[in-house]
């Protein structure tokens, strides 16, 4: 049995302003009640090392994604990030791609590496595929991705990427069951096999729409 510890440690020492030890990654999660499949950022079993979660109080999907004015989100996110840092996390991530909006502010606010969104991978993927291919950016809701989301993670307007959302290919019922405001039940649930089929189907359609797609990044 592999244990999540290092039995070879013979000496320990405090780090300035750090309260806890042993967790490498701190994860900011939304103030929403929904489950995560194994492999989901919200499910700690996805990681082969200890993680520390922090709820960003008052910031739900409805607030972060749908609200026009996102400024009320900033201070709660900063508090969550600072708490994770002070607890001893060596890096901070966030569970939802729409946190990209605040990448620059949070990276400047704490002294550990910050990865607020999977969209950070897009510029890297663009370099990998070269200028003659495009990177597909697949979002849960394309209409809610603003220019600041892209600017904050270094995605250059007009560069070699294309973006689509679930709404471009119809409904994904298991997504609605988990996350869609006004549709999901009070205690959301979903079935993995159904979700997998729906996501793969629309991902394949997206790829087929762009024969020069060299990579795809999921928001």
Predicted segments, located by residue:
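Short, acidic/small-residue loops that bind anionic groups at enzyme active sites
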Residues: 105-129
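A short, acidic, amphipathic alpha-helical segment used as a generic capping/interface helix at domain edges
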Residues: 194-214
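Generic structural signal for hydrophobic
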Residues: 83-84, 106, 206-209
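N-terminal glycine-rich anion-binding loop in soluble enzyme alpha/beta folds
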Residues: 2-74, 139-144, 148-191
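Active-site-proximal loop->helix
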Residues: 127-133, 148-153
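Gly/Ser/Thr-rich loops at beta-strand to alpha-helix junctions
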Residues: 33, 91-103, 115-121, 140-145, ...
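Long, hydrophobic/aromatic-enriched structural stretches that serve as scaffold segments
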Residues: 71, 75-101
């Amino acid at each position: 049995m592999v244990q999540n510890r290092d039995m070879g440690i013979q000496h320990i020492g405090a780090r300035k302003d750090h309260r806890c030890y042993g967790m490498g990654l701190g994860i900011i999660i939304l103030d929403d009640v929904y489950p995560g499949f194994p492999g989901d950022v919200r499910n700690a079993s996805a990681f082969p090392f200890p993680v520390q979660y922090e709820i960003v109080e008052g910031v739900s999907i409805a607030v972060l994604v749908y609200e026009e004015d996102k400024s009320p989100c900033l201070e709660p996110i900063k508090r969550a990030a600072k708490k994770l840092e002070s607890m001893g996390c060596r890096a901070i991530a966030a569970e939802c791609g729409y946190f990209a909006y605040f990448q620059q502010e949070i990276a400047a606010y704490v002294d550990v590496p910050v990865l607020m969104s999977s969209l950070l991978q897009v510029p890297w993927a663009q370099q990998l595929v070269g200028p003659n291919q495009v990177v597909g950016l697949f979002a849960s809701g394309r209409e809610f991705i603003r220019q600041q989301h892209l600017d904050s993670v270094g995605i250059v307007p007009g560069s070699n990427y294309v973006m689509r959302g679930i709404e471009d290919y119809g409904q994904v019922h298991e997504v609605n069951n988990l996350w869609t405001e006004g549709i999901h039940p009070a205690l959301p649930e979903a079935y993995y096999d159904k979700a997998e089929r729906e996501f793969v189907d629309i991902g394949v359609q997206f790829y087929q729409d762009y024969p020069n797609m060299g990579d795809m990044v999921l928001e």
